[in-house]
């Protein structure tokens, strides 16, 4: 079998966007059809090889690193179908699994539609954001997976499966957050809504103001996110609503300019590599340049942008990212604890954090039946669900109960906190002390990590071959296996069962060690 027939090539070097990890797979494939994907999977089985599928490489973790076979679906990026519902309050768009979000946005824009909620970037593939539990920030919207109507997947046996709520629901629940372990997503149908602009207000608030308004703040707007600057003791409160008002000029960004960006990265390099106690002063300087100093609650600056521009943001530089989700009701305790720990660490010159610490929310609760949609306009709040099945590996609190939009409180919400440490000019900065404290705090509050981020865990939580603590690099993942088993319980066992059924020869267990130390597979697999 000539593997070059399927776009295979050697000597390809994969690097993730952050530049933290790289690998040279034995073969790198870019198939252009489902049939080619099937043949590659069958060839891997024949030759006893594993396959990992990659898209944009935006996960900062090492979950996609392999020295065996790697597949990229960038050539599978076509629109397959577009169906509006009768009253045109939503539409179902079917695209190939390798389609990047920015191309989906272009397709939808031409048809007058948009995705319902997005994360911070649009470079990923649709298969990638489904597989990793991507989310935006809203008290009404949940994971992007909740907008998925159906999936077409090639499993480890080379079979092409159609999955939705009624057809193979168990496999569907596993595939809507699969970490690439169930199969290769070659097609997806996404429920989208009529296009809208986002009118956002951006306000400077004191950290104490955030705590004071905690109980009412998170449900005050359909889209909301907060950027916390601990050393400055201020936050940026961003709130957005859907609108048909005409678009305005986007906000000016000091660090979005060539000079500002270079200067900020240089300051980070100096504070990381030469004199860490400079870090709080760098934060205060950058905050003043970007936002000013005066609290602007109630009189922030306003911008009206298309939905994609409103959702997406500038993620600046290469970075380590550790994001966890916990019950919003525990959020005040978490923020106060982290604030105290960050201040104490700086006073003792123990460690320093980079900013912003991003604070977001989501509502992953699901109704028992599809809500009525005939009344909706393009500015109506809340989601139009593609399915009502919770993924087995959803890391958000499972105990929250659904409530209609007008009754949503913090008790329905997941609080996401994103701890970021930049890698100025692609040089590593220490993360272990800060991320370990952060993880302990979030875990104590009922939190769980985002699967695709740089969570560290502990040698006491891992399974399989574990090194002595001193043998790990500062940023190296130790593992979370025992915690994962506690957190996910029977859902994890069902996921494992589905995985074994769909991939009995472990074709998709590239980088098996990652799956093992985090409890996705058992030691005997």
UniProtKB/Swiss-Prot annotation:
The keyword Nucleotide-binding belongs to this UniProt entry's keyword annotation: no
EC category: oxidoreductase
Cofactor: FAD
Compartment(s) where it occurs, according to its Swiss-Prot or TrEMBL record: Mitochondrion membrane
Domain FAD-binding PCMH-type, first and last residues per copy: 20-195
Location of Pros-8alpha-FAD histidine modifications: 58
The protein's annotated pathway: Cofactor biosynthesis; D-erythroascorbate biosynthesis; dehydro-D-arabinono-1,4-lactone from D-arabinose: step 2/2
GO cellular component labels: cytoplasmic side of mitochondrial outer membrane
Keyword annotations of the record: FAD, Flavoprotein, Membrane, Mitochondrion, Oxidoreductase
Annotated EC: 1.1.3.37
GO molecular function, one term: FAD binding
Transmembrane segments: none
Coiled coil: none
GO biological process per UniProt: cellular response to oxidative stress; dehydro-D-arabinono-1,4-lactone biosynthetic process; mitochondrion inheritance
Catalytic activity: D-arabinono-1,4-lactone + O2 = dehydro-D-arabinono-1,4-lactone + H2O2 + H(+)
Family from the record: Belongs to the oxygen-dependent FAD-linked oxidoreductase family.
Annotated protein name in UniProt: D-arabinono-1,4-lactone oxidase
């Amino acid at each position: 079998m000539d593997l070059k027939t399927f776009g295979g090539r050697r000597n390809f070097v994969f690097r993730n966007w952050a530049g933290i990890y790289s690998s040279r797979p034995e073969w790198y494939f870019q198939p252009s059809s489902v049939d080619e994907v099937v043949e590659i999977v069958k060839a891997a089985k024949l030759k006893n090889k594993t396959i990992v599928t990659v898209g944009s490489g935006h996960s900062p973790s090492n979950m996609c690193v392999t020295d065996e076979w790697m597949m990229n679906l960038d050539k599978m990026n076509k629109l397959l179908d577009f169906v509006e519902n009768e009253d045109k309050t939503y539409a179902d768009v079917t695209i190939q699994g390798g389609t990047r979000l920015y191309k989906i946005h272009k397709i939808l824009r031409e048809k007058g539609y948009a995705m319902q909620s997005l994360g911070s970037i649009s470079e990923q593939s649709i298969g990638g954001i489904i597989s990793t539990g991507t989310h935006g920030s809203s008290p009404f919207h949940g994971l992007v997976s909740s907008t998925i109507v159906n999936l077409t997947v090639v499993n480890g046996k080379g079979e092409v499966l159609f999955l939705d709520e009624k057809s193979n629901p168990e496999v569907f629940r596993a595939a809507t957050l699969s970490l690439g372990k169930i199969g290769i997503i070659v097609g997806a149908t996404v429920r989208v809504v009529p296009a809208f602009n986002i009118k956002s207000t951006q306000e400077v608030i004191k950290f104490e103001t955030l705590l004071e308004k905690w109980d009412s703040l998170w449900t005050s707007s359909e889209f909301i996110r907060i950027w916390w600057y601990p050393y400055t003791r201020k936050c940026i409160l961003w709130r957005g609503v859907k609108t048909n008002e005409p678009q305005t000029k986007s906000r000016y960004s000091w660090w979005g300019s060539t000079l500002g960006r270079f200067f900020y990265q240089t300051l980070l390099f100096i504070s990381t590599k030469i004199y860490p106690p400079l870090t709080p002063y760098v934060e205060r300087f950058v905050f003043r340049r970007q936002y000013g100093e005066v609290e602007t609650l109630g009189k922030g600056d306003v911008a009206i942008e298309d939905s994609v521009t409103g959702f997406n943001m500038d993620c600046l530089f290469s970075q380590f990212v550790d994001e966890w989700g916990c019950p919003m009701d525990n959020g005040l305790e978490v923020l106060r604890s982290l604030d105290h720990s960050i201040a104490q660490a700086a006073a003792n010159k123990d460690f320093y954090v980079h900013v912003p610490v991003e604070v977001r929310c989501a509502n992953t609760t699901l109704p028992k039946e599809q809500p009525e949609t005939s009344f909706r306009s393009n500015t109506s709040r809340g989601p139009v669900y593609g399915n009502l099945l919770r993924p087995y590996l959803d890391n958000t609190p499972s105990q929250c109960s659904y409530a209609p939009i007008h009754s949503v409180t913090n008790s329905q919400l997941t609080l996401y906190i994103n701890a970021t440490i930049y890698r100025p000019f692609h040089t590593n900065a220490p993360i272990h002390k800060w991320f370990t404290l952060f993880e302990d705090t979030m875990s104590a509050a009922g939190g769980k990590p985002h699967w695709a981020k740089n969570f560290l865990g502990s040698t006491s939580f891992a399974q399989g071959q574990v090194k002595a603590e001193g043998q790990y690099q500062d940023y190296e993942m130790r593992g979370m296996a025992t915690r994962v088993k506690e957190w996910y319980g029977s859902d994890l066992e069902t996921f494992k069962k589905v995985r074994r059924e769909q991939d009995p020869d472990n074709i998709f267990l590239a980088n098996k060690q990652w799956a093992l130390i985090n409890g996705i597979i058992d030691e005997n697999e």
